[in-house]
A protein has these predicted regions:
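Active-site nucleotide/adenylate-binding loops and adjacent lid/helix of ATP-dependent enzymes
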Residues: 6-12, 76-80, 120-202, 207-210, ...
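Short acidic/His/Gly/Ser-rich catalytic and metal-binding motifs that mark active-site loops
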Residues: 17-22, 169-172, 253-256, 319
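ATP-dependent carboxylate activation and anion-phosphoryl transfer catalytic cores
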Residues: 132-137, 267-360
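Hydrophobic beta-strand scaffold residues
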Residues: 61, 111-112, 140, 161, ...
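Phosphate-binding site of ATP-dependent enzymes
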Residues: 3, 183-263, 267-278, 301, ...
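ATP-binding N-terminal substructure of ATP-dependent carboxylate-amine bond-forming enzymes
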Residues: 1-111, 118, 122-124, 147-153, ...
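Alpha-helix N-cap recognition
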Residues: 68, 181-182, 332
């Protein structure tokens, strides 16, 4: 691990549509409403856990908040941290601006953890990501993209289908109604997605099977796939689609949340684990992810592996899937955070050495 004591700024975003409410809550920055699961009473936030881990590692952590105002960007330009630990998901609540934040940090010449702007935008636009997967021979469900007034077909697809926003993450826009069985249901869902989220609708083959998550630590050249995590959907009521809906993931008071859980994937033979690992690594590299990331997959009953999407900056709370996988690999939470720091610092050091060599 990096031996030197580092000044590390935890960069995170907050937003509130009511500026008056924001002013009143300055001492307790609000999360985006759709991420409210992160602020469950008595549970530490991911940034608080990371802050404590950095202290245990001997570093000097601090918080840096992006609140959607230009002033916060100006303040970031004066940041003197040795490394930015990037936890941002949006700017002023706009998820499509996530890559802009990272691009801005790049322009400032600051070191930071996680994916660069290109990787974020490739992963965020699910239709583009799926085209890249297909180019690299990585299986992904056949799909079409519905824009207002036109549909862009990539393949012939058949029902049942799942319809979701092309740009959102965190299962936003995915509920029991997302799985459609006929043209009427499909068109109604497409219209709902376009109106509610102002986003193209991704129309995708619904793949029956197990929901498998592969956490990955490492660079493009050298990456380690952590033990597989399964979101067990088997106890969902009959007739309820076996999907990772928003309620399943975040709404603790719902029946579907209580009936599902993430756990170390069991009953996977070595060949299947290798196939899942190889697929996850291929997707990680295809989208140029780095330091850490998570690949969400479906394992079909016939053994086929389909990549559903990639998450370049997965949630790092200690009770969530990535940390769960790291723990199963033998890493404590503090060691996991230390590994991410080491990867980011090594990457920046190697880039500096390469630049210096090129100038000789």
């Amino acid at each position: 691990m990096i031996g030197a004591k580092l000044k590390i700024a935890l960069l995170y975003d907050v937003w509130n549509e009511d500026p008056v409410a924001t002013a009143k809550e300055e001492t307790t920055p609000p999360h985006k409403p759709r991420k409210k699961v992160k602020t469950v009473k008595k549970e530490k936030t991911d940034r608080e856990e990371i802050f404590e881990a950095l202290q245990k590692l001997g570093h000097e952590p601090s918080y840096f908040e992006l609140d959607g105002r230009p002033q916060s960007l100006h303040s970031l330009s004066r940041c003197d941290a040795d490394l930015i630990f990037n936890l941002t998901e949006s700017f002023d609540g706009d998820d499509t601006k996530e890559m802009n934040v990272v691009a801005y940090v790049d322009l400032l010449g600051l070191r930071y953890t996680g994916a660069g702007p290109h990787a974020i935008i490739l992963a965020q636009d699910k239709a583009i990501a799926k085209k890249i997967f297909a180019f690299h021979g990585i299986k992904t469900p056949f799909f079409a993209t519905a824009y207002r007034g036109r549909i862009e077909h990539a393949h012939d697809i058949s029902f049942p289908l799942i319809v979701k926003p092309s740009w959102e993450d965190g299962s936003i826009g995915i509920d029991a109604g997302a799985v459609v069985k006929n043209v009427k249901e499909m068109m109604e869902r497409v219209e709902y997605i376009q109106d509610e989220f102002d986003s193209p609708a991704l129309i995708e083959e619904y793949i029956e099977g197990r929901e498998i998550y592969a956490g990955i630590l490492g660079s493009y050249e050298r990456a380690e796939v952590l033990p597989m995590i399964e979101l067990d959907l088997s106890r969902l009521p009959e007739g309820t689609p076996k999907i990772a809906s928003y309620d399943v993931k975040f709404e603790k008071n719902t029946e579907v949340y209580k009936l599902t859980k993430s756990q170390i994937a069991e009953n996977l033979d070595e060949e299947t684990v290798n196939r899942l690992s190889d697929t996850a690594l291929a997707a990680y590299r295809a989208l140029k992810l780095r330091d850490y990331g998570r690949i969400d997959m479906r394992l079909a009953p016939n053994g086929d592996v389909y990549v559903i999407e990639a998450n370049p900056n997965p949630w790092l709370a200690s009770r969530q899937e990535f940390a769960m996988a790291a723990k199963a690999s033998g890493l404590s939470y503090t060691e996991m955070i230390g590994a991410i720091i080491d990867l980011a610092m090594s990457r920046h050091l190697n880039a500096n050495l390469a630049a210096a060599a090129a100038m000789r």
